[in-house]
Amino acid sequence: VAGLWEETDESLIGPLVDLLYNDPSEEVRTAAAEALGAYVLAGELDEIDPAQAMRVEEALLSVLHSEGEPLSVQCRALESIAYSGESGVRQLIDDGYYSPYEEMRVSALVAMARSADIRWREAAAAELISPDPAMRAAAARACGELEHRDALPDLFDLLADEEKEVRLAVLFALGRLGGKDAIEILTAAATSEDEEEAAAAEEALEESLFYQNSEI
């Protein structure tokens, strides 16, 4: 199941939904919930049959509304359903954000980013100072995805974060947000002795130039 994230072959919807509902392995069900996200997005873009898209969304919603479901399955289901434009999804994201479980709160930030709903900008920015590095990283990516340019000063500060996952997320966000200061920082970061961070900065620079050219 892993590796099917970018796959949108409609013939796989039935098997994936069946795995989500019935597989005895939590790991497999979690992977199925994640893989179905591509179909939700494809449905929003009118790239698959509407009835099939609805089938996918109903399966994910069923998992989210079912008590006793493993947390990891519900987290991936929330991230996947976030691509949907259905009005009830916003409440699901909000519920996830206020969950007592850290993993679900992180997934809520991922979902905010995928929703492309700018109403989540302030919530995402507020988590840039979270004591939890996974939350800071997810928040940074969300600020980038939601094009929250007002968050740039806080993102610049996070480049000194002690956690690499946070710094990498910030580099991604700067690539999405662009601007003179961001490009200067990314250019400098591309010469980092840390190969992973240098590669992330180079990729972010390319991303920044792509978005800049697409706006011309």
What feature does the model see in each segment?
Residues 2, 18, 34, 75-79, ...:
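Residue-level signature of alpha-solenoid helical repeat scaffolds
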Residues 2-5, 37, 82, 113, ...:
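Structural signature of alpha-helical solenoid repeat scaffolds
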Residues 9-21, 42-66, 86-98, 117-129, ...:
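Amphipathic alpha-helical scaffolding segments comprising HEAT/armadillo-like alpha-solenoid repeats
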Residues 10, 25-27, 69-72, 102-103, ...:
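Alpha-helix N-cap/helix-start positions at coil->helix boundaries
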Residues 14, 30, 58, 71-75, ...:
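Alpha-solenoid HEAT/ARM repeat scaffold
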Residues 36-41, 208-210:
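Hydrophobic residues within the alpha-helices of tandem HEAT/HEAT-like
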Residues 49, 63-89, 102, 106:
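Solenoidal tandem-repeat scaffolds enriched in leucines and small polar residues
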Residues 199-216:
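Terminal, low-structured helical/coil segments at or just beyond the last alpha-helical repeat
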